[in-house]
Design a protein with these regions (language model features):
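Charge-rich, low-complexity N-terminal segments
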Residues: 1-64, 69
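Short, hydrophobic/amphipathic alpha-helical patches that form generic packing surfaces
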Residues: 13-19, 72, 124-132
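Ampiphathic alpha-helical segments that act as solvent-exposed interaction surfaces
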Residues: 114-139
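N-terminal segment of the canonical double-stranded RNA-binding domain
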Residues: 40-119
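Small-side-chain structural scaffolding
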Residues: 2, 13, 107-108, 119, ...
Length: 139
């Protein structure tokens, strides 16, 4: 039976922390050295938790990396983006894919663009979508 991925792995969490600066994180990894870590769920958002506790972990030399559950990742993906020229609609497609489409009218021609991001599971699909939107400066 396949195991369902419910949250970002440590490498995804590190990259998302650089992109999102912990925005929307609802859990965190406590890191003990390079390879040993423990996952902890926050009863409040990671940002709220960090206000009260991160300094204590820093003093104890325990590195803390924000982590995102599937529901937290989904909530970060906008349904629509307007970049000044385009309206981009983001919808959930089939096979764990998010489909980004946008319309642009230029010289009376209608152009339709589609970007499809797929992965083996929804956590990876959300991660790839957030990463791609960041690279496109749309997040």
């Amino acid at each position: 039976m396949a195991k369902i991925k419910r949250y970002t792995d440590i490498s995804q969490a590190r990259i998302l922390d650089e992109i999102l600066l912990s925005k929307g994180a609802d859990m965190f990894f406590k890191c003990f050295g390079e390879e040993t870590y423990d996952l902890t769920f926050c009863e409040v958002s990671y940002s709220e938790w960090a206000k009260d506790y991160k300094e204590l972990y820093d003093k104890a030399c325990i590195k803390v990396i924000p982590c995102w559950s599937l529901s937290a990742l989904i909530s970060l993906i906008p349904q629509e983006i307007f970049d000044g020229e385009y309206v981009i609609n983001i919808t959930e497609g089939s096979d764990n894919r998010w489909v980004l489409t946008y319309d642009h009218y230029e010289n009376r021609k209608h152009s339709y663009y589609s970007l499809s991001i797929g992965a083996d599971n929804l956590v990876d699909a959300c991660y790839e979508t957030i990463n791609k939107l960041h690279k496109l400066k749309m997040l």
